């Protein structure tokens, strides 16, 4: 056993050295192959394009703060098209990078492939197939290119639903499973990656494998939250439950951050309480659209604005309880008891009763409104963080009441809500803090093409504050410009991440836009 452990350690050290050398050695453009020249193969005729419109579209994402151009775009009609392309790259002396792109909701070019090939996953969506629901086993098999809203529509037809969601449903299944998939349900049901039973994955060697916690388990756990580094998900089996009919939706306003967080932490500690919990902040210099949604009655807008002006920063707690015919007579009593137990500002409690679908798809209304005003396809210099519970008060003082107020440029929602670590799985690749409770903090900014750099600068100021204060903050939907940043990001799990990369994508072909590894070519 001792000899085995020594050999394992030596192998891991060797792998790490190879990766470090590769990362520190720039690959010049004259050695980088051009996929359009390489892929003059009949099997890709009509499926691979280098048209200016296709390349431009693949270079642009939701973030609109960077453009990274591929040489070509693959428009696959089957999984085999993707497998063949990866095999071709892997077997080539000069391999080319390749990235899967779903709905393009990355914010920093993470789904790009400079001088490589971007795979348009949505081209494989077939309305006549791709989603299969098992009512007896309570799962849905879905092609990874489908959007979560499409999955929801299909499962609701049978009275079933997945239990873990993102706030925005127009994201692909494969995209969120490669990152984590979080929202206000995470504290109770876990992120989307912990609600997966099985997947089909194409590795960086062009091999397709079915994996689960019991079959090819290392690949299964590597891919979930793995930022696309180990394989492209083509199918996922998602857990389902009986769908509720409606949602009792409450919001409470706070002026004291400690009471706000204490109430949040108490609510998420209950095993059978609310189904959804999120928090957010309001600042006195923020645009009214940050909070003047249709949720708050117009008659209260002046009251809320006055409180925001007086306190400069206030906090909103949002909770939801799902119900149906069997619980419709008890849900009001449960929510009334919850309201009485909270330390919110009295007189500032708001309530709505909506359908389950309308609640889950609530962001869509805002999206359509912004699109109608030409304010959707704009820069989104987002920053998403995981902050340990013991550091959240320091974060409030230094960031919410410090950097944010001082810079006076807030635009877009700022979320802050806790999650339970025991709902995550350490075998998966996603990086999270070590504490039992940690907070998701999201600066979901919108900016102009002429001023987004100011928001980006503020993001860097926030990150520097957290680093200088040694807060143990970890980025979600991460972006790091150097290998050192990624080593810090994964911490003690970095060596495992490197070993898995070497195992499943040894030529560093997949997802180069994450900027974690550089590709390795044969000599």
Swiss-Prot record:
Signal peptide: 1-31
Keyword Signal among record annotations: yes
EC supergroup of this enzyme: oxidoreductase
Residues covered by the FAD-binding PCMH-type domain: 66-243
E.C. no: 1.5.99.12
Localization, UniProt: Endoplasmic reticulum; Vacuole
Cross-referenced Pfam families: Cytokin-bind, FAD_binding_4
Listed name of the protein: Cytokinin dehydrogenase 3
Species in which this protein is naturally found: Arabidopsis thaliana (Mouse-ear cress)
């Amino acid at each position: 056993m001792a000899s085995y452990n020594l050999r394992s350690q030596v192998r891991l050290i060797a792998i790490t050295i190879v990766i470090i050398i590769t990362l520190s050695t720039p690959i010049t453009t004259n050695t980088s192959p051009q996929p359009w020249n390489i892929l003059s193969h009949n099997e890709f005729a009509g499926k691979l394009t280098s048209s200016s419109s296709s390349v431009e579209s693949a270079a642009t994402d939701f973030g609109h703060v960077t453009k990274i151009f591929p040489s070509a775009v693959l428009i696959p009609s089957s999984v085999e098209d993707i497998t063949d392309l990866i095999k071709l790259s892997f077997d080539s002396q000069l391999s080319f990078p390749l990235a899967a792109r779903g709905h393009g909701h990355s914010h920093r070019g993470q789904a790009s492939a400079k001088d490589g090939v971007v795979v348009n996953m949505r081209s494989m969506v077939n309305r006549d197939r791709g989603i299969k629901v098992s009512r007896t086993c309570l799962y849905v098999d879905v092609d990874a290119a489908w959007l979560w809203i499409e999955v929801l529509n299909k499962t609701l037809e049978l009275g079933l639903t997945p239990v873990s969601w993102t706030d925005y449903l127009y994201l692909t299944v494969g995209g969120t499973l490669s990152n984590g998939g979080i929202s206000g349900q995470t504290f109770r049901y876990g992120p989307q990656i912990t609600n997966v039973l099985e997947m089909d994955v194409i590795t960086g060697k062009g091999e397709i494998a079915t994996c689960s916690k019991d079959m090819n388990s290392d690949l299964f756990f590597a891919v979930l939250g793995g930022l696309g580094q180990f394989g492209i998900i083509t199918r996922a089996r998602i857990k389902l439950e009986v769908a509720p009919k409606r949602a009792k939706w409450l919001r409470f306003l706070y002026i004291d951050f400690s009471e706000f967080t204490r109430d949040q932490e108490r609510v998420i500690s209950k095993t059978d309480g609310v189904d959804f919990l999120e928090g957010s902040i309001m600042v006195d210099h923020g645009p009214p659209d940050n909070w003047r949604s249709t949720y708050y009655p117009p008659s209260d807008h002046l009251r809320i604005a006055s409180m925001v002006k007086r306190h400069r920063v206030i906090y909103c707690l949002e909770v939801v309880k799902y119900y149906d015919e069997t619980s419709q007579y008890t849900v009001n009593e449960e929510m009334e008891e919850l309201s009485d137990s909270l330390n919110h500002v009295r007189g500032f409690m708001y309530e709505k009763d909506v359908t389950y679908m309308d609640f889950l798809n609530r962001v869509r209304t805002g999206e359509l409104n912004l699109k109608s005003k030409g304010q959707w396809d704009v820069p989104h210099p987002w920053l998403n963080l995981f902050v340990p519970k013991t550091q959240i008060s320091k974060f409030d003082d230094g960031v919410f009441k410090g950097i944010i107020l001082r810079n006076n440029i807030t635009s877009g929602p700022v979320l802050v809500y806790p999650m339970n670590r025991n709902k995550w799985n350490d075998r998966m690749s996603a990086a999270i803090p070590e504490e039992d409770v940690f907070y998701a903090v999201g600066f979901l900014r919108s900016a102009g093409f002429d001023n987004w750099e100011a928001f980006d600068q503020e993001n860097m100021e926030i990150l520097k504050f957290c680093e200088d204060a040694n807060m143990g903050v970890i980025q979600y939907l991460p972006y790091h410009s150097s290998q050192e940043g990624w080593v810090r990001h994964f911490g003690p799990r970095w060596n495992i991440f490197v070993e898995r990369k070497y195992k499943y994508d040894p030529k560093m072909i997949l997802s180069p836009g994450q900027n974690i590894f550089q590709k390795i070519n044969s000599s």
